[in-house]
């Protein structure tokens, strides 16, 4: 979310910078946990959790079981859908764990609390990379182990270069690291969308 200001003092709020272009002379991020007061003409933080500061939580005890249950619940909540859905599987630890949890719940409908069979009981997983990339092999290994319908999307360097203009337009940054990470995801998202999977 962004907030922008024009020379006449009008305040604009938009979810994309593109919407403020041509209207505002200056703009800035509308930070989470803040509100804007037109009377005071400034942003004020209203929401702050104690765990925002490491010192406040550094001595907390952690329960492996509580973390396990919270992670499973968080993934399960996201699986309510009336359309086919899939997971992005890089082969790394995070995506592998999340994909395995999603696969665990894929055969039954979350909406019926597991009482009904899912309309599409096979979870699709997706990986993207240049041909021969080691991440693709790791993703395939995980997909085979957890039993997803796996789709490996290969792209060429030229396809990546051709997509950069669109990627920059959508992510609204020229940051090299962000563009480099977003380009394969953009190409992958186009394929997933064309398959009718969310």
Regions found by a protein language model. Give the residues of each.
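Short, flexible loop segments at the rims of nucleotide/cofactor-binding pockets, characterized by
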Residues: 175-181
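Active-site adenylate/phosphate-handling loop in enzymes that bind or generate adenylated species
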Residues: 179, 187-198
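Cysteine-centered catalytic environments shared across enzyme families
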Residues: 1-174, 185
């Amino acid at each position: 979310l962004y907030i922008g200001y024009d020379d006449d003092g009008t305040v604009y709020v938009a979810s994309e910078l593109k919407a403020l272009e041509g209207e505002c002379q200056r703009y800035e991020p509308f930070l989470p946990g803040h509100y804007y007061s037109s009377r005071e003409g400034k942003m004020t933080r209203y929401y702050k959790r104690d765990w925002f500061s490491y010192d406040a939580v550094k001595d907390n005890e952690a329960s492996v079981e509580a973390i396990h249950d919270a992670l499973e619940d968080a993934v399960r909540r996201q699986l309510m859908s009336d359309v086919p859905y899939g997971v992005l599987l890089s082969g790394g630890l995070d995506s592998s764990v999340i994909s395995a949890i999603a696969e665990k719940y894929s055969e039954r409908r979350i909406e019926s609390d597991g009482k009904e069979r899912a309309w599409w009981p096979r979870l699709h997983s997706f990986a993207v990379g240049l041909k021969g990339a080691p991440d693709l092999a790791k993703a395939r290994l995980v997909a085979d182990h957890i039993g997803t319908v796996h789709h490996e999307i290969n792209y060429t360097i030229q396809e990546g270069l051709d997509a950069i203009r669109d990627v920059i337009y959508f992510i609204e940054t020229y940051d090299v690291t962000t563009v480099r990470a977003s380009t394969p995801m953009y190409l992958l998202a186009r394929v997933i969308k064309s398959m009718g999977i969310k």
